Amino acid sequence: MQGFKVAVAGATGNVGREMLSILAERRFPVSEVVALASSRSIGREVSFGDRILKCKALESYDFSTTDICLMSAGGAVSKEWSPKIGAQGCVVIDNSSTWRMDPDVPLVVPEVNADAAKGYGKKNIIANPNCSTAQLVVALKPLHDRAHIKRVVVSTYQSVSGAGKAAMDELFSQTRAVFTTDPVEAKKFPKRIAFNVIPQIDVFMEDGSTKEEWKMMVETKKILDPKIKLTATCVRVPVFISHSEAVNIEFEQPITADEARDILSSAPGCLVIDRREPGGYITPHEAAGEDATYISRIREDPTVENGLALWCVSDNLRKGAALNAVQIAEVLNNRGWLKPKRKVA
């Protein structure tokens, strides 16, 4: 079978490197993989399976013979380049927030709304959701199908890798500074992150919510159901990888914890670890490097009719970003919605 020519834009970043790794791990059918970055990173080396790729400049790359661009170069770059890339007949799967709420751009989590990807043709762009939204809707979808969700209250515990490599470096350097009694410098975050939690992710909006909280609300509606009410409190925690969420759900129909556990145990993308004993649950440390959305602490909420509570954890660099993008590419291939371009001899 002829493979796809795939470009990874932002290949030197956390998510870009993970995209390359996952393309190789999952043996996505490629004829060629091209690593792209800014002009200042030309020649930098990144890994693709057992091969080493040298980065080329996004600004001068010709996409006319490329089938898919996995875009993880940031919102400003995506806003400028994704339409140009799409106009050359290359499908962009974008990890930034730039295109998520565009009515002509599908916002896709394959376990939830894979059919939406078929509508990519208007702009040749498909949007990846916010990392915290992706794992949430994977957990909510099978429960929504069973008992119809009315309202969700979610508190997130988001790792620093969601803010990039510089944020991971800051947590490391601050932690070291605390133990060596050196001054603690906060540059990437508004306050110290080491041994602390910060109840702000992204900028504040007029109603007092942060943009991250707003993203979770509007993206869940677009992906899952516009009638679902959702409120979120998003918190940055001193963890390197994996986001955790405490989720409270109110349903229209009755559903027990046992029913929910059975449903989630067989749901695509979910892995239930829920033993009512010390350590019988998942933590972000254990989820790092894994593909699943892990569900624990499933229980009924006696304070609201038809209520459940649960704990949800996933690797934000994988399911929350890179893995989801590659899964979208797999949907396009497996369903025949995208064919490799014919190469001119």
Which residues make up each language-model segment?
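A short, glycine/Asx- and small/polar-enriched loop/turn
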Residues: 40, 241-244, 289
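Oxyanion-binding "anion nests"
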Residues: 194-240
